[in-house]
Regions:
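Transmembrane and membrane-interface helices of multi-pass
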Residues: 2-231
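Soluble catalytic regions of membrane-associated enzymes that act on cell-envelope
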Residues: 194-537
Length: 537
C-alpha cells in the first residue's frame, strides 16, 4: 500500500491532473477579478469556500475535456515513450480550450451577469467576424494565453512513472485497469455518485445564488447545456360561441370580420377610422439605468423629455426578456420567452408557426430595419418565416453612403441609419396601406464606436456603453425632428424600448430585477393616448 501511494505521488498522471485543476482555479481567479464589480460583496471566508467548492465543480471538466490526455497517458504504451510530444500536444489543446472559453466569458460575463453556455456556439455562426473588436480590445489576454501555452508546453511532465497496462502479457490486469478507468471517468463526468449529474445550477446548493457563477466555470456551463431536449407539444384550442367550432385563436382573429377594438391592427374598424402606422424603435442596450427617469445619470435628455410628453405613455416597470440581442426578436414580436438553454431563433423550433405581431397586422405593410449584415443572428430568415414582408439590412443601404456611414465593426451608425429609415417610411407610406415597421439600432454595442464629430463631446466613459447611449439619444432626437415634418407622422404610433441592458455602476441594476429593466415609451403625436386607454391595460 505504501508503495502504491508513493507511485501515485510521483506519477506523471497525478501531476497532470493537479496541473489541470490548477489551470481551472487560475481561470476562476481571473474571472472573479474582472467581474467582482457586479457580484455582491463577500467575506474572505465565503471567497475561500467558493474556490474550494469550485474545485469540486471542476471535476466534470477535467474528466471530459482532458479525456484524450488520460487515455493516452494510461493506454499509450510504447508509443507514449517514443512520442512524448503527443502527450504535451493533447494536454495543451485541452488546457487552451478551457482557458479560451473561460477567457472569452471573463469579458462577456460583465455584460450578461452570468456564465455563458452552449449558446456561445450559436452566437458565432455567420457573425464570427464580429468577434474581431473583442479580440483587439483584449489583445493582452490573447498574448497572455499564448505565453501561458508556451509555458505549459515546457513544463508539462511527460517522462517518469506511468501506469503500465499490458493487455498481451497480463490481459486480466489490463482488463481490470480498463474497467477501473471507465468507471472513474463515468464518476468524473457525473461529478460524483449522486442521483443526477453535477450541473452548474447545483452551485446554488453550496453557495448563495448570487455568487454561483464564481463557483462554476464556462466549460462546465457548456457541458451542462449542450444537450438540447425537445419540448412537449401543446395544442391550445378555443371553443368560440359565435360559430361553435374549434379554431385556433389566431385563425379566429384573422378570419372573423367582426370589429374588435382590443385588436385594432387585426382588421378595419369601419366608420371612417384610419388605422395608424405602427413603428417600433428598439435601441441597442438601452437600460432604464441610463435614463433620467431611471433615477440614474441621465444620458438620454431627449427620451426624458419625450417620456413627459402628454402624448406619451411611459411604463416604469418593464423588463427585457434576456441579456442578448438575439433573444429580442422572438420575444418582442412573437411573445416567446427565453426558457430554453438555447436561443429560439437558432433552435429546432425556429421554423414553427407561432402567433406574431406581423401575422396579426392584417392589412398592414410590414418591414424590419437593421443596419447590420442581412444574415446577422438569423433575424432575416426567422422574420421572413413569420410573415414579414420586407427585411432591410446593410445590403439595402445606399451604396454611395456606405463608406461614410459604416462604423467599422457592426454596421451603419444610428444617426444616418435612422434618417435612412425615414426615407424608407416615405416610400412605404403610399396612402394605400398603413405601415407596421421596426428599426433596431446598433451603435450602443461593443466596441462603442461613435462618429468622429461626436468623439470627446458626449457624457459617459468612452470605454463603456454610456457615451454611445448619449449618441443614440441624439440620433433619436434628430430622427423625430425630421419625421415630424412628414405627412405620415401624425398618424403614427411609436413604441421605443431596449433589447436588453448592459453595464452599470449601480448595485441595484445588477440585481435579479434591475439587470433586466428597460424603458418602454408609447408615443402618439396625433392622439392623446391617456384619454383612449382601455381599462386594465
Amino acid at each position: 500500500m505504501k508503495s502504491l501511494f508513493k507511485f501515485i505521488a510521483k506519477s506523471n498522471l497525478t501531476q497532470q491532473i493537479l496541473l489541470a485543476f490548477a489551470l481551472l482555479t487560475f481561470s476562476r481567479l481571473i474571472w472573479f477579478t474582472a467581474n467582482a464589480f457586479w457580484l455582491p460583496p463577500i467575506g474572505i471566508d465565503e471567497y475561500i469556500w467558493a474556490h474550494l467548492v469550485g474545485i469540486y465543480f471542476d471535476v466534470p471538466v477535467v474528466a471530459a475535456v482532458f479525456l484524450p490526455v488520460w487515455i493516452w497517458v494510461i493506454f499509450g504504451g510504447q508509443l507514449r515513450e517514443k512520442h512524448p510530444w503527443i502527450n504535451k500536444a493533447l494536454f495543451l489543446l485541452a488546457a487552451l480550450t478551457t482557458l479560451i472559453f473561460n477567457g472569452i466569458d471573463t469579458g462577456y460575463s460583465q455584460v450578461t451577469a452570468k456564465r455563458s453556455g452552449f449558446e456561445l456556439f450559436d452566437m458565432l455562426g455567420d457573425d464570427a467576424n464580429k468577434l474581431t473588436p473583442y479580440i483587439l480590445d483584449n489583445l493582452g489576454i490573447i498574448l497572455g494565453l499564448a505565453a501561458l501555452g508556451y509555458f505549459l508546453f515546457r513544463i508539462i511532465p511527460v517522462r517518469g512513472q506511468y501506469p503500465q497496462v499490458d493487455f498481451k502479457g497480463r490481459p486480466l490486469r489490463g482488463l481490470i485497469t480498463a474497467i477501473a478507468f471507465a468507471a472513474t471517468c463515468l464518476v468524473g463526468f457525473r461529478g460524483g455518485l449522486q442521483l443526477r449529474p453535477l450541473r452548474s445550477i447545483d452551485a446554488s446548493t453550496f453557495v448563495a445564488p448570487e455568487i454561483a457563477p464564481l463557483v462554476t466555470s464556462t466549460p462546465l456551463q457548456i457541458i451542462s447545456t449542450w444537450q438540447r431536449n425537445g419540448l412537449p407539444n401543446f395544442d391550445f384550442a378555443v371553443q368560440w360561441p359565435n360559430n361553435g367550432t374549434n379554431n385556433n385563436t389566431t385563425d379566429w382573429l384573422l378570419k372573423n370580420t367582426q370589429p374588435l377594438p382590443e385588436f385594432p391592427m387585426s382588421r378595419s374598424q369601419g366608420g371612417g377610422w384610419v388605422q395608424p402606422n405602427i413603428v417600433f424603435i428598439v435601441v441597442e442596450s438601452l437600460a432604464r439605468d441610463y435614463t433620467g427617469f431611471g433615477n440614474g445619470t441621465p444620458f438620454t435628455p431627449f427620451l426624458d423629455r419625450l417620456a413627459a410628453d402628454p402624448n406619451t405613455l411611459y411604463f416604469p416597470y418593464c423588463y427585457a426578456n434576456g441579456t442578448k440581442s438575439i433573444e429580442m426578436v422572438p420575444s418582442l414580436f412573437c411573445g416567446m420567452p427565453s426558457l430554453m438553454s438555447e436561443f429560439y431563433v437558432t433552435s429546432a423550433y425556429a421554423n414553427n408557426k407561432v402567433n406574431n405581431a406581423f401575422q396579426l397586422a392584417k392589412g398592414y405593410k410590414t418591414a424590419f430595419f437593421h443596419g447590420s449584415n442581412n444574415g446577422t443572428m438569423g433575424f432575416q430568415s426567422f422574420l421572413k418565416q413569420t410573415g414579414l414582408q420586407q427585411y432591410h439590412g446593410i445590403d439595402q443601404y445606399p451604396a454611395n453612403l456606405y463608406k461614410r456611414d459604416f462604423d467599422g465593426n457592426w454596421g451603419i451608425f444610428d444617426e444616418p441609419y435612422l434618417q435612412h429609415f425615414i426615407r424608407c417610411m416615405d416610400t412605404l407610406n403610399d396612402g394605400k396601406q398603413p405601415v407596421f415597421a421596426s428599426v433596431f439600432t446598433l451603435s450602443s454595442h461593443h466596441p462603442y464606436t461613435i462618429p468622429k464629430p461626436y468623439q470627446g463631446k458626449l457624457p459617459g466613459d468612452p470605454s463603456t456603453v454610456q457615451h454611445t447611449i448619449a449618441y443614440a439619444d441624439i440620433a433619436l432626437r434628430k430622427f423625430f425632428e425630421t419625421a415630424s415634418k412628414k405627412p405620415w407622422f401624425e398618424n403614427t404610433v411609436f413604441v421605443i424600448t431596449g433589447d436588453h441592458t448592459s453595464h452599470s455602476d449601480k448595485e441595484y441594476f445588477y440585481s435579479q430585477s434591475g439587470h433586466y429593466e428597460v424603458p418602454v415609451l408609447v408615443y402618439s403625436p396625433g392622439v392623446n393616448i391617456s384619454e383612449n386607454l382601455i381599462p386594465g391595460q
